[in-house]
Regions:
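Short amphipathic alpha-helical interface segments
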Residues: 529-569
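Short, amphipathic alpha-helical interaction segments positioned at domain boundaries
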Residues: 600-639
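A short, conserved structural fragment
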Residues: 587-601
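Conserved C-terminal portion of the radical SAM core fold
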Residues: 1-4, 27, 300-301, 306-310, ...
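C-terminal accessory regions of radical SAM enzymes
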Residues: 4, 20-22, 35-69, 73, ...
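Radical SAM [4Fe-4S] cluster-binding motif and immediate context
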Residues: 229-394, 406
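Short amphipathic alpha-helical interaction segments
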Residues: 572-588
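Glycine-rich beta-alpha loop elements in corrinoid/cobalamin-binding modules
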Residues: 8-41, 93, 100-222
Length: 639
């Protein structure tokens, strides 16, 4: 069997999807070859341009390849897409956009021809395509070429882009696909291959769509089949590294090794965020910590790479007590990416840092309590700020988004955020964001009326990538158009927040600082250089003032502040002049924006210089399909 992955996966990651399936097939006695052909396309058009295109909304990456399906299949080269100016504001140099898209057409055609010619596909009886990130157009184009060249070949699609009704729709619109797997592929792929080889019908094979002898598309019920947490799979990335060497890319990028330690989301299983459509299977399962550690050690030893990219939707909570301390105890000098929930304690973040987790995506999404409640995030704004502050101290890079345009939001939320953001200039700004999108499987999508959303169908631009009936297009894609119920009122203005975010990014790039340094004798000084266009301001603190400021590090309920500080630090409380003196000091700090009033608490904003970790270079922006923007070299794009 051949296992294939096409653009637009990140070239800096081997395909864990193919490696997982190959391992499962080996355990069933079925041989397979892995073909990570997205790397070839990145090498052909240049990694900078590849990353730029791959991070755009899905309709344009899909169109780059779908025109090579519908052109020869239906005589439609999908040129109408060009009239829509599909790059929008996302292309760095608009004057080059048309030239780049025009140049891609013959290059992509040549890539597809070479792909079929350079591999002996006659060696295989089944080809499986993994579809995850805007890979449908490319997979359809290649499936057509292979099926026409080798009519006896069986073609299977699977992956998250085939979940739910999307999979059966693929069968309806593409006659070159024989079966589509909707569920986790390890559960059924071996049985599916055996049935193909034995010429047995696919009827009753759970979670698989297929055609009857009469051509009708049938989807077998999944029966809640999910992978358990006791599996044992050995990931093999040999094919990827051989490909890098063959293409001359081994010295041009720093790969990350993807791994998986859980599936599902322990928070989403209880309360799914309203906008989140990451997957249709939220049931949470974590793998055995010892098995994960053994796999990481084997991968590092075999490939000499110590950068690990977790594919988990969320870090398993139990790993704070098991996997991460064990990594630290063994002294591994590793670097990790993980997705986490934002309401972590500092001690938990210290555990992450000690294990080498230097890049997190915490799902902050907003800094306003009302907006976070609308999203059902389960966190408060002060917890998001604490995470940013502590990650800054611990040398953990945060990639996070700021979302706008939620149904039911108010202008007051954005007024509050616009006032708050300049006070946070010393912390990590959002790396992405914008108006929320309507994704399949999200609560907003599943129950639009309950949230004041009027569903309009598939995103309008997809019709230029897939010229099919609207009812099929609505079932095929992940991104959808919508309007908001007029009863929700006029759209709120976000210009002030967007301008504040731009200022935040500029200040952060210029080294904005707000830091408390503790001196001998218990005294301290706060250096405030958040406004990088002005000279920094020094705020000397005596011992009692330093103690109070440190006390506010995690935030203290304002109503209980005097009572608790007197209880815990009686001598300092008296030195400050009791409750009235302490209140006057806090008022001065509030006026200077050294502390803020948030969620009913008084929260200190300065990071602690005495506990800052050594600064490390942030992870590369092209490491994976994350929220981080891609830096593009103009000369490389033109070349």
């Amino acid at each position: 069997m051949a296992l294939v992955s096409l653009p637009w996966m990140s070239p800096t990651l081997p395909s864990i999807q193919l490696a997982t399936l190959a391992s499962a097939l080996r355990q069933e006695g079925i041989e397979s070859d892995v073909h990570e052909l997205y790397v070839d396309y990145g090498a052909r058009i240049g990694l900078n341009l590849y990353n730029l295109l791959g991070n755009l909304l899905g309709y344009l990456p899909e169109w780059v390849f779908s025109r090579h399906y519908y052109g020869p299949e239906q005589g439609d080269d999908l040129a109408a897409m060009l009239e829509q100016r599909p790059f929008g504001d996302d292309f760095p140099w608009p004057e080059l956009a048309d030239s780049v898209l025009a140049a891609l057409e013959p290059v992509t055609e040549e890539y597809l021809d070479d792909l079929v010619r350079q591999t002996d596909w006659s060696r295989y009886d089944v080809v499986g395509f993994s579809l995850t990130i805007s890979q449908l157009g490319a997979s359809m184009a290649v499936a057509r070429r292979l099926k026409r060249a080798f009519p006896a070949l069986r073609v299977v699609f699977g992956g998250s882009q085939c979940a739910g009704p999307m999979g059966s729709t693929i069968l309806r619109i593409c006659p070159y696909v024989d079966a589509v797997v909707h569920i986790e592929g390890e559960l059924v792929l071996a049985d599916l291959v055996r049935r193909f080889r034995d010429r047995r019908p696919l009827r009753g094979l759970a979670g698989v769509s297929h055609r009857t002898s009469g051509g009708e598309v049938v989807t077998e019920p999944a029966a809640e089949l999910v992978m358990g947490g006791s599996r044992k799979l050995d990931l093999d990335y040999d094919a990827y590294f051989h490909r890098l060497l063959r293409l001359g890319l081994a010295d041009k990028m720093n790969p990350w090794l993807p791994f998986e330690s859980s599936r599902g989301c322990w928070y989403g299983q209880k309360v799914q965020c309203t906008f989140c459509g990451l997957h249709d299977i939220m049931e949470f399962r974590a793998w055995d910590a010892d098995a994960v550690l053994a796999q990481l050690e084997r991968l590092q030893e075999r490939y000499g790479v110590a950068r690990f990219y977790s594919m988990d939707l969320i870090l398993p909570r139990e790993y704070l007590r098991t996997l991460l301390p064990r990594i630290a105890e063994r002294g591994h000098d590793w670097m990790f990416f993980y997705e986490v929930k934002a309401n972590m304690r500092r001690s938990e973040l210290e555990t992450l840092a000690a294990a080498g987790i230097r890049w997190v995506q915490p799902g902050i999404e907003s800094l306003d309590a009302d907006l976070l409640a609308l999203m059902r995030k389960g966190v408060k704004p002060h917890q998001n700020i604490l995470l940013l502050k502590w990650c800054h101290e611990l040398g953990i890079y945060c990639g996070w988004n700021l979302l706008y345009g939620l149904p039911g939001e108010s202008q007051a939320s954005y007024t509050r955020m616009a006032e708050l953001i300049p006070k946070l200039a010393h912390l990590q700004p959002p790396s992405g964001g914008g108006r929320f999108q309507l994704h399949r499987f999200s609560p907003y999508f599943e129950h639009p009326e309950a949230h004041g959303i009027q569903w309009q169908g598939a995103h309008r631009m997809y019709r230029y990538a897939f010229p099919i009936a609207k009812e099929d297009l609505d079932q095929l894609v992940y991104l959808h158009d919508f309007t908001l119920d007029p009863a929700l009122g006029e759209p709120v203005g976000t210009a002030a927040v967007e301008a504040a975010v731009q200022g935040w990014r500029r200040a952060n790039r210029s080294g904005a600082t707000l830091a408390l340094t503790e001196l001998s004798g218990g005294q301290g000084v706060i250096l405030d250089h958040r406004d990088v266009e002005k000279a920094p301001t020094r705020h000397p603190l005596n011992q009692a003032e330093t103690t109070l400021y440190r006390y506010l590090d995690v935030g203290v309920a304002e109503k209980l502040l005097a009572e608790r500080f007197q209880r815990d630090h009686r001598a300092c409380f008296d030195a400050l002049g009791g409750e009235s003196g302490m209140a006057a000091l806090v008022a001065r700090w509030l006026a200077d924006d050294l502390v803020i009033r948030i969620d009913g608490k008084i929260l200190a904003l300065a990071v602690h210089a005495n506990r800052m970790a050594p600064r490390r270079q942030p992870p590369p922006a092209d490491a994976a399909a994350a929220s981080e923007p891609v830096l593009v070299d103009r000369a490389a794009v033109m070349t």
